[in-house]
A protein has these predicted regions:
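Conserved P-loop NTPase mechanochemical-coupling segment
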Residues: 26-27, 31-38, 167
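Glycine-rich phosphate-binding loop and adjoining helix at the ATP-binding site
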Residues: 1-20, 39, 46-47
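Acidic-glycine-rich active-site phosphate/pyrophosphate-binding loop
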Residues: 15-31, 200-214
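Helical "lid/coupling" subdomains associated with nucleotide-phosphate turnover
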Residues: 38-60, 74-306
Length: 306
């Protein structure tokens, strides 16, 4: 991917440095991405989370990003995506590298809508990128969530006449199913009793009829359909330190200072050194190790260097 990007930019006559999004909401250099490609995993949802916070003007929130195939729900903490505390499985293998805390469900604009005798099912099957070929409003033959939104007057795309025959009760039942499943996913992301607003973004945001959630407002920011691109555009270069320190040999303040210096050093280069800030610091005592051991994790970030 790095080599292909270099070739594409060279073809366009662009010779400036370029960056890749990483899955903590910051940027990394092309060289760093080539060495640690795993850092790009799930960077798409983190861009949406950061972009949603920027567009809504909030630092702490729950973010719902509804795309064409899936809905991703994440948490924004102090302006950055919350990291998962659990192990992550990829291709059936347990991993221990950093990943954002996400709940994903198979509902999006391209989701199949199946109508039964007593209920309506939405997803997880989807027409995906073939939406404009297979959805009813685009002269296709598959009933999708987008068709439901058009029939309900929530979206103005395609040919509304193609879904005018849908019974109102079925349309309302499908929308209720979507809203119910999204509410459950949002509930799964709540780890405290803090009152957090919910930000709804993505091209499929009109599918959800929520105006409030547990007494908190649901924010639908302007330009929310491009929150992913916005999150990538506003991202800062990032650096991180994650080490265990023995406090029998140094003070806690010295350990924190060393960790901050390492995070800043990783960040400087792709970022302007004077603008680098510490955006996150966690210190976790490790009682199962001898002595006074503590795991210190520090994240630094700053705007890309000119």
């Amino acid at each position: 991917v790095v080599a292909s990007s270099e070739t594409a930019l060279a073809t366009l006559g662009i010779g400036c440095p370029f960056f890749f999004s990483q899955n903590d909401g910051t940027l990394m250099s092309a060289e760093f991405a080539a060495r640690f490609p795993v850092r790009t995993f799930a960077s798409g949802p983190t861009n949406s989370i950061r972009g949603a916070g920027f567009l809504a003007g909030v630092q702490d929130a729950l973010v719902v990003d509804i795309g064409g195939t899936t809905t991703d729900v994440g948490a924004l903490r102090r302006g950055y995506p919350r990291e998962s505390a659990n192990t992550t499985e990829l291709a059936g293998l347990r991993t221990n590298f950093r990943m954002p805390d996400l709940v994903s469900i198979g509902i999006g604009g391209g989701s199949h809508v199946s109508v039964g005798d007593t209920h309506v099912t939405v997803g997880p099957r989807s027409v995906g990128r073939l939406l404009t070929q297979q959805a009813l409003v685009f002269s296709g033959s598959t009933l999708t969530a987008t068709d439901i939104a058009v029939a309900a007057g929530l979206l103005d795309v395609g040919d509304p006449g193609a879904v005018a025959h849908l019974p109102r009760a079925q349309v309302e039942q499908a929308l209720a199913t979507i809203t119910r499943d999204v509410e459950r996913a949002v509930d799964a992301m709540r780890v405290s009793s803090d009152d957090l607003p919910v930000i709804l973004v993505g091209g499929g945001a009109p599918l959800v009829g929520l105006d409030a959630f547990h007494g908190q407002p649901v924010i639908r920011p302007d330009h929310g359909h491009v929150a992913n691109a916005v999150g990538s555009a506003i991202a800062h270069a990032g650096g991180e330190s994650d080490r265990i320190y023995n406090l029998d040999k140094m003070s806690r303040e010295e350990a924190v200072s060393l960790a901050e210096a390492e995070a800043r050093e990783q960040c400087v280069g792709p970022a302007a050194s004077l603008a680098v800030e510490i955006v996150e610091l966690d210190a976790l005592p490790l009682t199962y190790l001898p002595g006074q051991s503590v795991r210190i994790r520090v994240k630094a970030a700053g705007p890309p260097a000119a």
